[in-house]
Curated annotation (Swiss-Prot):
Pathway: Cell wall biogenesis; peptidoglycan biosynthesis. This is Glutamate racemase. It comes from the Bacteria. Substrate binds at residues 14-15, 46-47, 79-80, 190-191. Gene3D superfamilies: 3.40.50.1860. It comes from Haemophilus influenzae (strain PittGG). The lineage of its organism: Bacteria, Pseudomonadati, Pseudomonadota, Gammaproteobacteria, Pasteurellales.
Length: 269
């Protein structure tokens, strides 16, 4: 079939299920497209991995899936991975590669108190490109940084059907609880929009939550909108992971709620 006659196939990749926050915005905007989602749970969390390992695992997974489902675009729905894998992916694939960047610029434009919090993984908050974003767009703001793996784990548990541990969440955010003029929070990890309501309970002074998911969905549409969007009946949205996990059977039962037909385990060497 000619490439222009099929609906675009888009792969979302993350170390966990945080990328759901980006996928759900894309599916809301472009409901008839063909979506694949891969979470590298065998390598989770990426914030604890070396850059070389993140690059290797991301490339391997994307290339393996591309062999089976020729891709029209890849969305790295992970802030930590986006800081290191975009150049090698763009060298390996002749298709759009879309990353996620913390929404520091829009945060600096919307804050009234000029006091912003950047909530991200430990790996992301240390990256030099975060310094560059702040220097470029938020020089007139105080930008607090909090790197956390715990909140990523809490979001993972929520999406797998467990209740959110608010005590642990409050404890992790306690250093910001007394900052009365902290009015804007940058959700610098794709997991965090999944627990935004719970975060807001812990930080009631925050008025603006900056989530780039909707902007990423619009970017996908812009890059691929010249394609025919007529759905093909033989195509189903598919999910992949890289290791079996305890809640797998329960997780599979909920797949249809997110618009996926099946979950398959793929192996990355």
């Amino acid at each position: 079939m000619d490439k222009k006659e099929k609906r675009p196939t888009v792969l979302f990749f993350d170390s966990g299920v945080g990328g759901f926050s980006v996928y759900r915005e894309a599916k809301k905007l472009l409901p008839n497209w063909h979506y694949l989602y891969c979470f590298d749970n065998a390598g989770f969390p990426y914030s604890e991995r070396k850059e070389e390992s993140i690059i290797h695992r991301t490339l391997a997974a994307c290339q393996l899936i591309n062999q089976r489902y020729p891709l029209d675009a890849i969305v790295i729905a992970c802030n930590t991975a986006s800081t290191v894998v975009l150049p090698p992916l763009r060298a390996a694939f002749d298709i759009p590669i879309i990353g996620t960047v913390p929404a520091i610029k829009p945060a600096s434009e919307i804050t009234k108190t000029k006091h912003i919090g950047l909530l991200a993984t430990k790996g992301t908050v240390k990256r030099h490109y975060i310094d560059e974003l702040i220097d470029k767009f938020a020089q007139d703001c105080i930008v607090e940084r909090l790197g956390t793996t715990k909140l990523v784990e809490i979001a993972e548990q929520k999406i797998r059907g467990h209740s959110v541990d608010l005590i642990s969440l409050k404890d992790e955010l306690s250093s910001w609880a007394g900052m009365a003029d902290l009015d804007t929070l940058v959700l610098g990890c794709t997991h965090f929009p999944l627990i935004k309501d719970e975060i807001q309970l812990c930080l009631p002074q925050v008025k603006y939550f900056m989530d780039p998911s909707a902007a990423i969905a619009k970017r996908i549409k812009y890059l691929l909108d010249d394609k025919n969007l007529q759905a093909q009946n033989e195509k189903y949205n598919q999910m992949f992971c890289t290791a079996h996990f305890p809640e797998e059977s329960q997780f599979k039962k909920a797949l249809h709620l997110w618009g996926f037909e099946s979950l398959e385990v793929i192996k990355i060497d």
